[in-house]
Amino acid sequence: PLSCGGFNVVCQNDVIGGAKVVLASGGLSMPKIASDLAVRCARGLGLEVVETSPALVPFTWNNADREQFAELSGVSLPATVSCGGTQFSEDILFTHRGLSGPGMLQISSYWQAGDVVQINLLPDLDAFAWLVAKQSDEAKTLLSTLLQKQLPKRLVQRVSGVWFKDQRVGEASHMSLRW
């Protein structure tokens, strides 16, 4: 920093002056591929440093969820993802480590530890109303069979019996269809 408040950056045979300088060296949220060099340099120069936080990063499973959902790696689908008052309607992607894709990466910029992230896997459908209608139209059809018309087959097979009781839709109570 210069005493007058600006900066001079020396580049080989040239000096470039400016009122402000931006130091960027990658994302600290990915320690295996990033560096805190820019932050250390800025602090070393006595500059004010905006506190860093992860952004545009995937969400990772805890051990129990990793075991339950690892086989869904590669499954993607459109979803509405929300946290607090912010929401995005973008694709999400199941990975071997967690959830990624445009929707999850965007909402990560608004998420703080302890916040709840809500994911609507059927954002363009009132799932409850659709299932109630199917109680008359397709009463003998299993819930998992119906859901495979709207969601990836591998996802439905994985969560059947965990998120919902797989039974004939005509036998399901309205309460059991709200999940």
For each of these PLM feature ranges, what is it?
Residues 8-10, 98:
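Short, solvent-exposed secondary-structure boundary motifs
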Residues 10-20, 87-90:
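Core beta-strand elements of the Rossmann-like FAD/NAD(P) dinucleotide-binding domain
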Residues 20-66:
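Glycine-rich loop(s) and the adjacent beta-strand/alpha-helix scaffold that form part
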Residues 1-6:
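A conserved short coil-to-beta-strand element within the FAD-binding core of flavoproteins
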Residues 47-51, 57-178:
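An anion/pyrophosphate-binding glycine-rich loop and adjacent beta-alpha core
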